[in-house]
Amino acid sequence: MCGFQITLVGTHIPGYMQDRGLGGWSATIILALIGLFNIIGTLGMGYLGTKYSKKILLSILYFLRAIIICIFIFLPPSFYTSIFFGITFGMLWLSTVPPTTAIVAQIFGTKYLSTLFGIVFLSHQFGAFAGAFLGGYFYDNFGSYDYAWYIAIGLSLFASLIHLPIDEKPLIRVETA
């Protein structure tokens, strides 16, 4: 979900903005703002994860991504919507990493955290491939990125719901003799 959205934006935002009549400058601004505000969002989410439920934070984060993408693609393209998207999507860009890592560590412990997070990151890369590929596929076959954006919105809504039933309590392990 996250990988799909990040790679869709990172790969296809220049073409999308060109299609919307705003040239390369808007994509440059968006990507620069995403990079800047990603730092703030990731640090902020790390802090919030020490104070609040990580699954709730992830649910809110993914729901906000859906809203931000909707605002961005359904409002008329402009300098202001580009700035809005760059700042807000940047705040949410990789802010999923601290609570996701913390949930994995909290539930499974830290002994195998590198292996478990490797599995999480592998699934992220499958999503990244899909975001890059499907963005191009839809554009080449339908002349628009709309379907890719709709998938990104749907994945955000799905992710916001699927995190809610997570039991954040550590798994009970039976010690072997």
Label each region the model flagged.
Residues 56-71:
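Structural signature of the two symmetry-related core transmembrane helices
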Residues 81-95:
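Hydrophobic core of transmembrane alpha-helices in multi-pass small-molecule transporters
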Residues 24-25, 110-120:
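Loop-to-transmembrane helix entry/capping segments in MFS-fold secondary transporters
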Residues 137-155:
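A membrane-interface helix-boundary motif in multi-pass transporters
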